[in-house]
A protein has these predicted regions:
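S-adenosylmethionine/decaboxylated-SAM
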Residues: 3-4, 12-154
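Arg/Lys-rich low-complexity patches in intrinsically disordered regions that function as generic
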Residues: 155-164, 173-183
Length: 183
């Protein structure tokens, strides 16, 4: 893979660990990986590389608030690496986050560091498929910088319609006619 930018948010070891972690998480049901926080594209390239190695049908959707002034961009690194399974979308981060968490099988969050509890609750309420969430905790980056959580959809019991109450005549007894013969 050709990461063209000199800026590295993750050490080479952490980036390799992220790629291997995601590669191990991808299974036959994985269709979308959501990355929140593109920045310079280092994690984007690793996620797309893991998806590309494991399955041609897995897409990486990378969202961020704005295009940081890093040059070369994530798109340029992806193109140089011949990886085309990724879309990078910018702007309206909160709206896009809510929209895409429903579709993602794997979510990598490298943003919202101060609001992660709030975002995890949003994920738990809205996922419709089992989803693995990887959160990069910059405070923990000396050790293992990733926290992994598996979230399953909340199955809510359906409200059943009660049939309308009608009087039934189950207790009716049929009167027998008896004839007395008189002589």
């Amino acid at each position: 893979m050709n990461y063209l930018n000199r800026f590295k948010q993750l050490s080479d070891e952490a980036a390799e660990a992220l790629q291997n972690l995601v590669k191990d998480m991808i299974n036959k049901n994985t269709t979308n990986i959501l990355e929140v926080g593109t920045y310079a594209g280092q994690a984007t390239l690793r996620l797309a590389g893991a998806a590309n190695e494991k399955s041609n049908s897995v897409r990486v959707i990378s969202i961020d608030e704005n295009h940081d002034s890093f040059s070369p961009t994530a798109e340029e690194s992806l193109k140089a690496s011949n990886i085309f399974n990724t879309s990078v979308e910018l702007g309206e981060l909160n709206k896009r986050f809510e929209e895409y968490i429903v579709r993602a099988n794997i979510i990598y969050i490298d943003r919202f560091h101060n609001k992660i509890d709030e975002k995890m609750e949003l994920i738990k309420r809205n996922v419709i498929i089992p989803t693995k969430v990887i959160f990069r905790n910059p405070k923990n980056s000396d050790d293992f910088p990733f926290e992994v959580t598996e979230v399953s959809p909340q199955v809510k019991p359906r409200a059943r319609k009660k049939p309308p109450v009608t009087e039934t005549t189950d207790d009716k007894t049929i009167a027998k006619e008896t004839k007395k013969e008189t002589t």
